[in-house]
């Protein structure tokens, strides 16, 4: 089934509201095996909305509209769809009573314009709105399906999940499932080169995407049987792992910090961190993970040289000879925070995140990450690109990946 989404609302075109509905609907429809080929945003204008509907009718089997169902004069979606289809608007008494009950619950009397929300194109299947006053509806005409949904996500999502999902599932006999493989330490072009033969596979498909400092390979399989689909995905994941190897750090929703915390918990080991350029972001990422208190002993943000010297015990001679952004300082920061916290591991970050502070010898993007155990210290020098936020985020990923690799017995690049 070919589908498209028409999002109605001038506020979307002005950039006043982020269109999260289209993202949500596309994800849900993909799970039903419905291919979404087009997203259209259109303002609250009858003629332009009719143009969009005319185009959609000529290329799609399923058209979903969002927004424009409220009580005001610029809420024109149902009226425009009805006119486009040549259908009269008829009042639904049950929907009208629901509107009255909604206002009674909040101790108010509905104004007359609210009752326009109880009118629908003739023959439409009504979709109750348990979270607002604007019901949706489904219209089947000329072998096409039009589904009209409210704009607020707090109303659209429950309506879709309770009514629309099951309706569409009965209309389709295919299911789509996806799995996301997360890769760190290789660029997108390198990953694409390594898996290029797999990118031409038709079912399942493999698509490379760029995350925030990492690369994603999305496996998508389509079929009629859940077991068959799962087996296709498992087989493709196995092939990808055979090519990419230890650069794969997580699958689906799992993040790098979750992987590291789980490994620390499994091995009953503890970690302490000392941060300069990342400003506490490393500690935040770790402590965002439930159960991190069992493995995370201490976090120190030592932004100034005085803090590095007085709190962490970095030698004054080190700072004077090599500077705060140096191999030697990162090494001492990692060693000393481990001892200070009585932890198994110490992890440190020091660098120049920019946009100012760089020099020809030490440019913006220069970062050192230190990792100390009770037997050895490893320091990784990085040259990162991007703005301040990206440099900090990527530094954190590199730091966590060092811990991941050490705990898994993988060579630290």
Curated annotation (Swiss-Prot):
Q: Which InterPro entries match?
A: CinA, CinA-like_C, CinA_C, CinA_KH, Competence-induced_CinA, MoaB/Mog-like_dom_sf, MoaB/Mog_dom
> According to the UniProt record, which cysteines are disulfide-bonded?
none
Q: Which domain of life is it from?
A: Bacteria
What SMART domains is this protein classified in?
MoCF_biosynth
The record's listing under Gene3D superfamilies reads:
3.30.70.2860, CinA-like, MoaB/Mog-like domain
* Pfam families (UniProt xref): CinA, CinA_KH, MoCF_biosynth
Q: Which family does it belong to?
A: Belongs to the CinA family.
Checking HAMAP family in the record gives:
CinA_B
Q: What is this protein identified as?
A: Putative competence-damage inducible protein
Write down the species: Thermoanaerobacter sp. (strain X514)
Gene it is expressed from = cinA
């Amino acid at each position: 089934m070919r589908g498209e989404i028409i999002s109605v609302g001038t506020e979307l075109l002005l950039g006043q509201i982020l269109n999260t509905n289209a993202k949500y609907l596309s994800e849900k429809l993909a799970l039903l095996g419905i291919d979404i080929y087009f997203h259209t945003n259109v303002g609250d204008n009858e003629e332009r909305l009719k143009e969009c509907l005319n185009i959609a009718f000529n290329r799609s089997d399923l058209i979903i509209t969002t927004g424009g169902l409220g009580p005001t004069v610029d809420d024109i979606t149902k009226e425009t769809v009805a006119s486009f289809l040549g259908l009269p608007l008829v009042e639904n008494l049950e929907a009208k009573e629901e509107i009255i009950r909604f206002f009674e619950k909040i101790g108010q009397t509905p104004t007359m314009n609210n009752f326009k929300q109880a009118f629908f194109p003739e023959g439409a299947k009504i979709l109750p709105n348990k979270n607002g006053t604007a019901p949706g509806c489904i219209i089947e005409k000329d072998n096409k399906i039009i589904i009209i949904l409210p704009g607020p996500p707090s109303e659209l999502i429950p309506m879709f999940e309770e009514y629309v999902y099951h309706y569409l599932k009965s209309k389709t006999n295919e299911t789509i499932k996806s799995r996301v493989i997360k890769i760190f330490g290789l660029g997108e072009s390198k990953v694409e080169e390594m898996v290029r033969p797999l990118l031409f596979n038709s079912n399942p498909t493999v698509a490379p995407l760029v995350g925030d400092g990492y690369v994603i390979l999305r496996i998508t399989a389509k079929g009629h049987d859940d077991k068959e689909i799962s087996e296709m995905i498992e087989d493709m994941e196995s092939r990808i792992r055979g090519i990419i190897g230890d650069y794969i750090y997580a699958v689906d929703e799992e993040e790098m910090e979750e992987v590291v915390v789980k490994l620390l918990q499994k091995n009953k080991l503890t970690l302490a961190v000392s941060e300069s350029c990342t400003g506490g972001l490393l500690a935040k990422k770790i402590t965002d993970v439930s159960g991190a208190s069992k493995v995370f002993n201490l976090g120190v943000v030592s932004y100034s040289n005085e803090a590095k010297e007085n709190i962490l015990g970095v030698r004054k001679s080190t700072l004077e000879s090599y500077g705060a952004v140096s191999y030697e300082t990162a090494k001492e920061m990692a060693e000393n925070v481990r001892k200070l916290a009585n932890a198994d591991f110490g992890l440190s970050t020091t660098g120049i995140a920019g946009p100012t502070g760089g020099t020809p010898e030490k440019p913006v993007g220069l970062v050192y990450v230190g990792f100390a155990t009770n037997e050895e210290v490893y320091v990784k020098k990085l040259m990162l690109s991007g703005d301040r936020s990206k440099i900090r985020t990527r530094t954190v990923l590199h730091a966590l990946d060092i811990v991941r690799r050490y705990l898994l017995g993988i060579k630290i690049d």
